[in-house]
């Protein structure tokens, strides 16, 4: 039989009141924080992705595809507004 590591068994942790008091606050707050992060548009700003209404501008309505492997930088300069 192996020795004890001194850690509490998982079943004791899950059935304790302290576990559920802590997690009944932290789990919903993480969900709400994630929902606010996405719904306010902050996720678009942090990760630099365009918002759904910014994929196609008034000047450019075609798909922004790179078709030439060796001229990709020039095509990218044409597609990205400065």
Curated annotation (Swiss-Prot):
Protein topology in the membrane: Single-pass membrane protein
Membrane spanning stretches: 21-35
Keyword Transport applies: yes
Record has Manganese as a keyword: no
Pfam families: Cytochrom_B559, Cytochrom_B559a
Keywords in alphabetical order: Chloroplast, Electron transport, Heme, Iron, Membrane, Metal-binding, Photosynthesis, Photosystem II, Plastid, Thylakoid, Transmembrane, Transmembrane helix, Transport
Cofactor binding note of this UniProt entry: With its partner (PsbF) binds heme. PSII binds additional chlorophylls, carotenoids and specific lipids.
Top-rank taxon, per record: Eukaryota
Compartment(s) where it occurs, according to its Swiss-Prot or TrEMBL record: Plastid, Chloroplast thylakoid membrane
Gene Ontology CC entries for this record: chloroplast thylakoid membrane; photosystem II reaction center
Binding site for heme: 23
Main location: plastid
Cofactor(s) recorded in Swiss-Prot or TrEMBL: heme b
Chain's role: This b-type cytochrome is tightly associated with the reaction center of photosystem II (PSII). PSII is a light-driven water:plastoquinone oxidoreductase that uses light energy to abstract electrons from H(2)O, generating O(2) and a proton gradient subsequently used for ATP formation. It consists of a core antenna complex that captures photons, and an electron transfer chain that converts photonic excitation into a charge separation.
Family, per entry: Belongs to the PsbE/PsbF family.
Quaternary context: Heterodimer of an alpha subunit and a beta subunit. PSII is composed of 1 copy each of membrane proteins PsbA, PsbB, PsbC, PsbD, PsbE, PsbF, PsbH, PsbI, PsbJ, PsbK, PsbL, PsbM, PsbT, PsbX, PsbY, PsbZ, Psb30/Ycf12, at least 3 peripheral proteins of the oxygen-evolving complex and a large number of cofactors. It forms dimeric complexes.
UniProt cross-references to PANTHER family, sorted A to Z: CYTOCHROME B559 SUBUNIT BETA-RELATED
Name the record gives this protein: Cytochrome b559 subunit alpha
Natural source organism: Ostreococcus tauri
Gene: psbE
């Amino acid at each position: 039989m192996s020795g004890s590591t001194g850690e509490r068994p998982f079943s004791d942790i899950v059935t304790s009141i302290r576990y559920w008091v802590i997690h009944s606050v932290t789990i919903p707050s993480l969900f709400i924080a994630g929902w606010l992060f996405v719904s306010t548009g902050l996720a678009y700003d942090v990760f630099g992705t365009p918002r759904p209404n910014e994929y196609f501008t008034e000047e450019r309505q075609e798909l922004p595809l790179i078709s030439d492997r060796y001229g990709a930088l020039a095509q990218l300069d044409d597609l990205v507004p400065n």
